[in-house]
């Protein structure tokens, strides 16, 4: 017997019972994006490797440890995308979408990182991201955060997420702080773990978000990044906080929040939860005003965020179980008798024409009434249409409410109107 081939570790199948809740959540997210004027952009999952090295940073964990990189048959180095912003910027430059233009874009799809798989963290995972180009004020930063807050309300999870904010300033401000932080860490190397010692010279700001409690205690004595902010960044951040206060959005300023990708500047933010164990970040983003120019375009202000859909689905299921998927089927058509199948299929097609939004499944594979009604229950149908030889002969169909058990014989010509009443 041939050996079964299974999915790659950390790359999961999502089966019909799971995808239904995904579809409902994604529909909610997309509706809110549309209400803010965002347009979808669809991007390749494979890009040239230098794109990510230049955008994310050569000495980040993503580039050093986590990317799926390979040579194609032409000898070109390609990478499965580990995040979406770099590809979105590349597309904007390539197709002339960014220079002297305002763009509000969103994308959705799989990303890939070679990490240790655990609940809420996978090697293939799905993100929804939104990016805004051409606007540099704190007002658009605030609107992006307001958009995400509207998502949480729509999904019934607003009480289970909290917003953390910081400003990491300009490139020059971070360089000055970096020097001061390295000097401080060099004096306390005995407290640092091996990972922090490695980061101390390659990417010292990442020491700030170390999970090591001894390192976090040590950092209480270090100077804060906020002490080194340039005046423009300080003013920008104050403006953002004022707008969020006016909108009634609660937040915590976390001066150790730096984000793991090198392209960020000024505003950074995360929505976090305590309901998913160690995988607490649900949505994160910030401003990246230098990235378009860094990737070959003209200087363009930009801000955006990305959200992990696996974690969002887990969170919705954990804290709002009433947010359930729509049933696969609204109506199940039961056909009994050798001469009824053709009539049943004809009636089903007519109802699909007259009721475009209805989910109607016709029974196939035969079976007596008991088996067919069991199938209707399996698919979650609210209504069964019963068509036997006598109904075919007199042009009627029996409409049965599967919740109340009530049933009525209705003329086939008027059954669509009757169904609309029942379905609301």
Swiss-Prot record:
The keyword Aminoacyl-tRNA synthetase applies. GO terms for cellular component: cytoplasm. This is Histidine--tRNA ligase. One of its GO terms (molecular function) is ATP binding. Keywords: Aminoacyl-tRNA synthetase, ATP-binding, Cytoplasm, Ligase, Nucleotide-binding, Protein biosynthesis. Coiled coil: none annotated. It is found in: Cytoplasm. GO terms for biological process: histidyl-tRNA aminoacylation. Its EC number is 6.1.1.21. It is an enzyme of class 6 (ligase). It comes from Salmonella choleraesuis (strain SC-B67).
């Amino acid at each position: 017997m041939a050996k079964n081939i299974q999915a790659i570790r950390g790359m999961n199948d999502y089966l019909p019972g799971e995808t239904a809740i995904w579809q409902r959540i994604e529909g909610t997210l997309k509706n809110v994006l549309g209400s803010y004027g965002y347009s979808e952009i669809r991007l390749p999952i494979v890009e040239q490797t230098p794109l990510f090295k230049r955008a994310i940073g050569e000495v980040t964990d993503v580039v050093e440890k986590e990317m799926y990189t390979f040579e194609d048959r032409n000898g070109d180095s390609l990478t499965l995308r580990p995040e979406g912003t770099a590809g979105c910027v590349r597309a904007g430059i390539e197709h002339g979408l960014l220079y002297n233009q305002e763009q509000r874009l969103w994308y959705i799809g799989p990303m890939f990182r070679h990490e240790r798989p655990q609940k809420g963290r996978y090697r293939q995972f799905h993100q929804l991201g939104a990016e805004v180009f051409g606007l540099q004020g704190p007002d658009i930063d605030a609107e992006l955060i307001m958009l995400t807050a509207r998502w949480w309300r729509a999904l019934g999870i607003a009480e289970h997420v909290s917003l953390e904010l910081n400003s990491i300033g300009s490139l020059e401000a971070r360089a000055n702080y970096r020097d001061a932080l390295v000097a401080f860490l060099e004096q306390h190397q005995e407290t640092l773990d091996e990972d922090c010692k490695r980061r101390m010279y390659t990417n010292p700001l990442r020491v700030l978000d170390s999970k090591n409690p001894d390192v976090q205690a040590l950092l209480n004595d270090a100077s804060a990044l906020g002490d080194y902010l340039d005046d423009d960044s300080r003013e920008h951040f104050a403006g953002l906080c004022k707008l969020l206060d006016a909108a009634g959005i609660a937040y915590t300023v976390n001066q150790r929040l730096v984000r793991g990708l090198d392209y960020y500047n000024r505003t950074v933010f995360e929505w976090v939860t305590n309901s998913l164990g160690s995988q607490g970040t649900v949505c994160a983003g910030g401003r990246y005003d230098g990235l378009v120019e860094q990737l070959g375009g003209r200087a363009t202000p930009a801000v955006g965020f990305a959200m992990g859909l696996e974690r969002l689905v887990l969170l919705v299921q954990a804290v709002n179980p009433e947010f359930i998927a729509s049933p696969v089927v609204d109506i199940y058509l039961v056909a009994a008798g050798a001469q009824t199948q053709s009539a049943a299929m004809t009636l089903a097609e007519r109802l699909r024409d007259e009721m475009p939004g209805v989910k109607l499944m016709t029974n196939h594979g035969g079976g007596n009434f008991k088996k067919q009604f069991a199938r209707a229950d399996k698919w979650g149908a609210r209504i069964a249409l019963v068509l036997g030889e006598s109904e075919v002969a007199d042009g009627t169909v029996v409409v049965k409410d599967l919740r109340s058990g009530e049933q009525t014989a209705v003329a086939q010509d008027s059954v669509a109107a009757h169904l609309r009443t029942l379905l609301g």
